[in-house]
Amino acid sequence: MMVLKVEELVTGKKSSNGETGEFLPDDFRDGQYEAAVTSEKQEDLKTLPAHHVSLAEQQWEREKQLEAELKKKKLEQRSKLENLEDLEIIIQLKKRKKYRKTKVPVAKEPEPEIITEPVDVPRFLKAALENKLAVVEKFLSDQNNPDVCDEYKRTALHRACLEGHLAIVEKLMEAGAQIEFRDMLESTAIHWACRGGNLEVLKLLLNKGAKISARDKLLSTALHVAVRTGHYECAEHLIACEADLNAKDREGDTPLHDAVRLNRYKMIRLLIMYGADLTIKNSAGKTPMDLVLNWQNGTKAIFDSLKENSYKTSRIATF
């Protein structure tokens, strides 16, 4: 086997015996190989300190590439929108996802209040106003009178009707509370129900026999009260139950007079639609139409006065 000398390997020069000259390429003869190796070594030394930095960069590149591949995979797994069925599937999936994320708060049921001590009249009346059924039941279970009242002769039934506490109204009526009991202004439960505007309570009272034609001290019917307080559904139900559309109060006003005076457009339309008389005069000799004209004339006078004052002010400003 041919053995090369180190000098011959580095310098690329032929040995004296001429056997090793053929080992090196022609380009690396005459010392060129030594220069090439030296240059390569120097370049390698230059890149050596940066080798450790490039490891971190390579790791970062691998992580970035892996992240890109995962993202691409997720995109490929998404539903493709090719027709309406695909669109419907996507919508349903989004709805389910939204439903899963939404936490429905579980409402805790209030613990039943247990009343053991006796309930006095003020507490009973207050409970009817504040919808405390347990207190009302305790008072009634002790065989107390359901028609006890305050200094204005307002009973628990009056208060419950005003606030629309249907369960308490039912409980009081089961205990024998008088539907036609009158307070100091001679209002009955039906007046208070219309004043409060609870349609279900009004229906219950009428079904239990409350007089639809009952009048208070001002001779107002329940329809008068419903119109004045603006409770449209109550007024409509009373009319459907054949309440008197043209009933007059102490001042001779019908419900239509009140509706016009208070400028309740929906009530005016309701009453006229069901046949309220536009020609009935009140104690002052005014029909509902007269009240409309008076209101228009009054409004016109106000605007005329404002216009005149504005004109005078502008003239003074010019001097």
Swiss-Prot record:
Induction: Down-regulated by doxorubicin (adriamycin), in vitro. Disulfide bonds: none annotated. One of its GO terms (molecular function) is RNA polymerase II-specific DNA-binding transcription factor binding. GO terms for cellular component: cytoplasm; nucleus. Its main location: nucleus. The keyword Coiled coil applies. Keywords: ANK repeat, Coiled coil, Nucleus, Repeat. One of its GO terms (biological process) is regulation of transcription by RNA polymerase II. Gene3D superfamilies: Ankyrin repeat-containing domain. ANK repeats lie at residues 152-181, 185-214, 218-247, 251-280, 284-315. It is found in: Nucleus. Residues 63-89 form a coiled coil. PANTHER family: ANKYRIN REPEAT DOMAIN-CONTAINING PROTEIN 1, ANKYRIN REPEAT, PH AND SEC7 DOMAIN CONTAINING PROTEIN SECG-RELATED. May play an important role in endothelial cell activation. May act as a nuclear transcription factor that negatively regulates the expression of cardiac genes. Interacts with TTN/titin and YBX1. This is Ankyrin repeat domain-containing protein 1. It comes from Oryctolagus cuniculus (Rabbit). The lineage of its organism: Eukaryota, Metazoa, Chordata, Craniata, Vertebrata. The gene is ANKRD1.
